[in-house]
């Protein structure tokens, strides 16, 4: 059953990798793909986080390694290296689903029930949707789930617990917010009065913190620079969410909208699982509570909760089997898997109202392939031999794929950039209603048009930094 579930979930993610060029949130480009592209290939738009040093190079560094590998074997077309990254993210997602299975098994669940619980992350529509995206939340899910599987098992050896704590540190280096899991694990061991285990974990996590500081020192020049600047932005500058604050019930509402049947069944089974896996339940509760009380909310922030709740559901099936009725447990397992399959089958109906982040402004818009047509035209533009500059007249540069899709050493302007008579670019991406120049390609209501043969006038003032960079730099005193 586990292999079947993983195969279906993996196939769905691979299919999505090939047909969806949309962007859920700019972070999946400008905090992962774009800095990696700039590191390997040269050109790239610069977000304030990676211009000022408010994020670690862990995730972009890993993606850069994939880009270097692609470049070495001749896969240097955007379609080739982007699909490579998406496939790698899909592999991480499937490994995360397997880690959820392992977590349930190590906490007492039989293979059938553990596999059913793993189906929550492997098959549920929202989890599949986020699977190919190069977000720190999805990239760090595997070390979290695997780390907890090693650390929380009653049969865990000292080596298991040390390795589990180390994996949580790796997740924190990739995404600072994951420090909540480190604190939650420590809280569990304090509650259990396991002082020797706690001492080992403190040593490991101290080493993990040192690794984070060392990475920042090597890449940014200062110890813990990414953490310090991010915390300063969040708490001193009060950098709030672009989409506005959300109520404490936000995540419950979004789970119920995006996968209502899975949420109902998995939550009920997870409650039963608490009877046998109090330590895991405590970790999940601490993680969710921390996000419930934080005004800045986004669905992707809690994506790692899905495999953890799935593991609890698998354990809950075992509890039902052992304490009440084996027949009831089998029926509940079948129901859980069926709801996951239904969620996958109806995944294409997901809207931004279901999974955010535009639930307040674009709730009825499909969550799939948003700005995908423009990104595909960026790829087409990058293949034009006579291109010497491009202006995107339909979207702010923050909301499209940047140089990760526009794979050329040429200026990339937004609609607020120089006018067409400037001579600084000779291609535009605009609406299909536009008639200037000659059409080269069209996609979904947008068209790439050639204004002239070039060459373009050099632009010594071209600035690859995204808007808002200078304001944040001044606020941080950099």
Q: Language-model features: where?
A:
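Signature aromatic-anchored transmembrane alpha helix within multi-pass, membrane-resident enzymes
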Residues: 2-10, 205-206, 210, 277-281, ...
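Hydrophobic/aromatic-rich transmembrane helices and adjacent perimembrane loops
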Residues: 37, 131, 137-139, 171, ...
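Start-transfer (signal-anchor) and selected internal transmembrane alpha helices
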Residues: 1-15, 105-108, 200-205
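Transmembrane-helix motifs of polytopic, lipid-linked glycan transferases
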Residues: 7, 83-108, 146
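Membrane-embedded, lumen/periplasm-facing catalytic core of multi-pass transferases
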Residues: 329-427, 432, 443-445, 461-478
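Membrane-lumen/periplasm interface segments of specific transmembrane helices
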Residues: 171-172, 178-245, 249, 253-256, ...
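Short helix- or helix-capping micro-motifs
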Residues: 9-12, 114-125, 149, 168-172
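Short acidic/glycine- and proline-prone juxtamembrane loop motifs at membrane-interface regions
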Residues: 25, 52, 126-139, 299, ...
């Amino acid at each position: 059953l586990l292999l079947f579930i993983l195969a279906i979930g993996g196939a769905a993610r691979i299919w999505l990798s090939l047909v969806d060029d949309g962007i859920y949130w700019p972070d999946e480009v400008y905090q992962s793909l774009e800095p990696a592209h700039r590191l390997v290939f040269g050109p790239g738009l610069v977000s304030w986080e990676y211009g000022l040093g408010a994020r670690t190079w862990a995730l972009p560094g890993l993606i850069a390694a994939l880009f270097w590998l692609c470049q070495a074997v001749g896969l240097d077309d955007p379609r080739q290296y982007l699909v490579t990254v998406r496939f790698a993210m899909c592999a991480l997602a499937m490994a995360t689903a397997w880690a959820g299975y392992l977590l349930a098994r190590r906490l007492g669940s039989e293979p059938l029930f553990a596999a059913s619980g793993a189906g929550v992350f492997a098959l549920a529509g929202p989890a599949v949707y986020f699977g190919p995206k190069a977000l720190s939340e999805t990239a760090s899910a595997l070390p979290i789930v695997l780390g907890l599987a090693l650390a929380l098992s009653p049969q865990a050896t000292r080596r298991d617990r040390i390795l589990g704590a180390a994996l949580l540190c790796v997740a924190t280096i990739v995404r600072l917010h994951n420090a909540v899991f480190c604190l939650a694990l420590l809280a569990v061991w304090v509650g259990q009065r396991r002082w020797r285990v706690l001492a080992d974990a403190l040593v490991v996590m101290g080493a993990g913190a040192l690794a984070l500081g060392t990475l920042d020192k090597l890449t940014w020049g200062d110890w813990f620079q990414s953490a310090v600047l991010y915390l300063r932005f969040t708490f001193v500058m009060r950098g709030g969410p672009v989409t506005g604050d959300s109520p404490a019930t936000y995540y419950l509402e979004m789970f119920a909208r995006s996968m209502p049947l899975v949420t109902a069944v998995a939550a009920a089974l997870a409650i039963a699982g608490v009877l046998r896996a109090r330590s895991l339940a405590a970790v999940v509760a601490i993680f969710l509570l921390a996000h419930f009380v934080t005004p800045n909310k986004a669905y992707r922030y809690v994506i790692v909760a899905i495999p953890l709740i799935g593991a609890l559901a698998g354990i809950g099936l075992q509890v039902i089997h052992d304490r009440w009725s084996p027949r009831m447990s089998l029926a509940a397992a079948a129901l859980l898997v069926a709801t996951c399959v239904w969620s996958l089958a109806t995944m294409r109906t997901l809207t931004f109202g279901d999974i955010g982040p535009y639930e307040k402004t674009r709730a009825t818009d499909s969550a799939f392939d948003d700005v995908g047509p423009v990104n595909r035209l960026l790829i087409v533009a990058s293949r034009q031999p006579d291109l010497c500059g491009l202006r995107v007249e339909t979207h702010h540069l923050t909301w499209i794929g940047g140089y990760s899709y526009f794979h050329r050493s040429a200026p990339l302007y937004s609609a607020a950039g120089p006018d067409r008579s400037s001579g600084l670019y000779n291609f535009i991406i605009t609406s299909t209603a536009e008639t200037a120049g000659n059409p080269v390609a069209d996609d979904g209501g947008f068209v790439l048009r050639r204004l002239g043969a070039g060459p373009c006038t050099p632009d010594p003032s071209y600035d690859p930094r995204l808007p808002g960079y200078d304001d944040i730099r001044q606020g941080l005193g950099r």
